Amino acid sequence: MPRVKRSVTARARHKKVLKLAKGYRGRRKNIYRIAKQAVMKAGQYAYRDRRQRKRQFRALWIARINAAVRELGMTYSTFMNGLKKSGIGLDRKVLADLAVFDKAAFEKITNQVKTSLAN
């Protein structure tokens, strides 16, 4: 059986990992063994944080809606309850956007919610 030399594939694999580690500090950017570990850990963080990003944005939207609704004399939970009862089908992302950039429209929605809760 012929001898297999792996220089071409090994070099390609090393180049690929070191390219991914570009911009890292210290030996993490130019020592293959350390760079490989750093790239693996970066991938784990990326995987985890893609899921956490969704939670963090939802929390941000809720905080913005809560702040805007409290200025108008309601709490977040009563506002969301009234929103469901009044049949307004806006999600938290759109509501938070309205609360920040279009206060007049958000105030109209809040008034609709208040009237639906009063009935």
Curated annotation (Swiss-Prot):
Pfam families: Ribosomal_L20
Gene Ontology MF term list: rRNA binding; structural constituent of ribosome
PROSITE patterns hit by this protein: RIBOSOMAL_L20
Alphabetic keyword roster: Ribonucleoprotein, Ribosomal protein, RNA-binding, rRNA-binding
Gene Ontology biological process terms in this record: ribosomal large subunit assembly; translation
Any Gene Ontology CC annotation: ribonucleoprotein complex
The organism's place on the tree of life at top rank: Bacteria
NCBIfam families, per the entry: rplT_bact (TIGR01032)
Biological role: Binds directly to 23S ribosomal RNA and is necessary for the in vitro assembly process of the 50S ribosomal subunit. It is not involved in the protein synthesizing functions of that subunit.
Family to which this protein belongs: Belongs to the bacterial ribosomal protein bL20 family.
PANTHER family: 39S RIBOSOMAL PROTEIN L20
Protein's UniProt name: Large ribosomal subunit protein bL20
Species of the source: Nitrosomonas eutropha (strain DSM 101675 / C91 / Nm57)
